From Swiss-Prot:
Gene Ontology BP term (one): pyrimidine nucleotide metabolic process
Record organism: Rickettsia rickettsii (strain Sheila Smith)
Entry keywords, A to Z: ATP-binding, Cytoplasm, Kinase, Nucleotide-binding, Transferase
Gene Ontology molecular function: any one: ATP binding
Full protein name: Cytidylate kinase
Amino acid sequence: MVDLKTKAFDISQNFTIALDGPAASGKGTIGLILAKKFSLKYFQSSIVYRQLAFDCISQKIDVTDIDAVIALSKELKLDNNFDLENENIGNIASQIAVISEIRNNLNKYLINLVKTTPRMIMEGRDIGTVVAPDADLKIFITANPQIRAERRYKQLQAKGKTCILAEILQQIILRDKRDKERKAAPLLPASDALIIDTSKLSAMEVVEEVTNYIKNKIT
C-alpha cells in the first residue's frame, strides 16, 4: 500500500485531493497553490453550477421552473468564454444547487472527471462526501463569515467591480444557510477530513499545514 507522502510527492503516482468548504473561505487560492506544489490538475466544481446558472440566464429560463433547469443540466457544456465569477451568477448557482436531481446530473460529470484524471485536486462543497469519497486526502476549509466577506470584497475590488461589503456578507450568510440546510449533500466535512480554520491564516500558512500533515500522516 502506497503511503500518502509517496502519493503526494511522487508524480508518477495517482493522487486525489478533495477540498471542501463554504464560499470565500480561501479554497480557490489554497487549491491553486496545492495544485502547483504537488503537480495536480485543479478543478473548481462550482464552475458546473455557475455554467448552468449562466445558461439559465442566457436562455431566459426561470430558476423556479425546476423541470426546465433539470432538463438543461443534462445537456451541460462548459464554456470558458464568459465571466462566471460574478455574484449574481453565484447566487443563482447556490439556489439551483439545492435541487437533488440537478446535483445528481452534474455530479456524474464531476465523478467521471475525478476517475479519469490521475492527479487532481477538486474543490467544492461536497467533494469529500459525495463526488470523491475515496480521495487520498480530504481537506475542509472554513473561516469566519465576516472575514470571508472582506476577502471576497477585496477580490471583487481588485477586478474593478463595484460592490458593497454589507451586501456580500448578507449573501455569504444566506449561501451558508442554503448549503448547510439543503437535503441533497449538505455542506459538512467528511468524517476523515483535515479541518482548517483560515480566519487567522494566510494561504501559504494553510499550505504549510497541509504539507506537514501529508509528511507526518501514518497510513
